[in-house]
Amino acid sequence: MLPKPLFDLALKLQYFPGVGVRSSQKLALDLLELEPDKYGELLEALSSVRAQIKFCAQCGFFAEEGAASGLCDICRDARRKPKQICLVEKPTDVLTVEKSEIFKGHYHVLENLISPLDNVFAEHTTLGALVERIKTLLDTPGATVELILFFKAGFSGEATTAYLKDLLSERGLEERVTITRLAQGLPMYYNPDTLDQATMVRALEDRREV
């Protein structure tokens, strides 16, 4: 039986996805055995992350507090293609696409996928902000935008895609926006976190128009 402070720490470490009872207890004991200076460095790093990491004002990926215009490194990178946007469900999915090392566009984090059965609707996503972003990109005559879907293709994914198409149609943007999905070789309910680099490269290169 762990002393209460250790037990409480182990319990709170289970807030992290995938951390169960045994692994949380091991982590708690590992923290207890850290040298004082390393323990202090860890606490400082945790505090710094909470204070200094925000979400990009344009795409929703991680950005550093005080960054120019509130944008992340990707959105500020002039070498990337702003009219090629990869749609992801959560910020960590950006890291999965980036490890392909071939995607040079921008991103847009949806935060949620539409799922009426789970009481998740369009207002719980950033689709509205995405459409406004697209309108700005299309201000230039003849400009086009490609949206690359990188989220699961189950019911919630299809509902999100359908709503996005409706929004684009309502705004008269559908003729200038191409929507593509990653290669059909991916499992329908794939977990973005588990995709390796080779799989990501093939999926991006073989993407198909929706």
Model regions and ranges:
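Extended interfacial segments that mediate partner engagement and assembly in macromolecular machines
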Residues: 24, 77-151
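Conserved phosphate/pyrophosphate-binding and hydrolysis machinery centered on Walker-type P-loop NTPases
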Residues: 17, 36, 49, 61, ...
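Short Cys/His-rich Zn2+-coordinating modules
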Residues: 5-11, 33-57, 69
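Signal for well-folded cores of large energy- and translation-related assemblies
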Residues: 14, 32, 47, 64, ...
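Cys/His-rich short segments
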Residues: 45-94
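Long C-terminal interaction/binding lobes of large macromolecular proteins
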Residues: 2, 103-104, 131-138, 144-210
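Extended, structured, electrostatic nucleic-acid-contact surfaces
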Residues: 1-17, 29
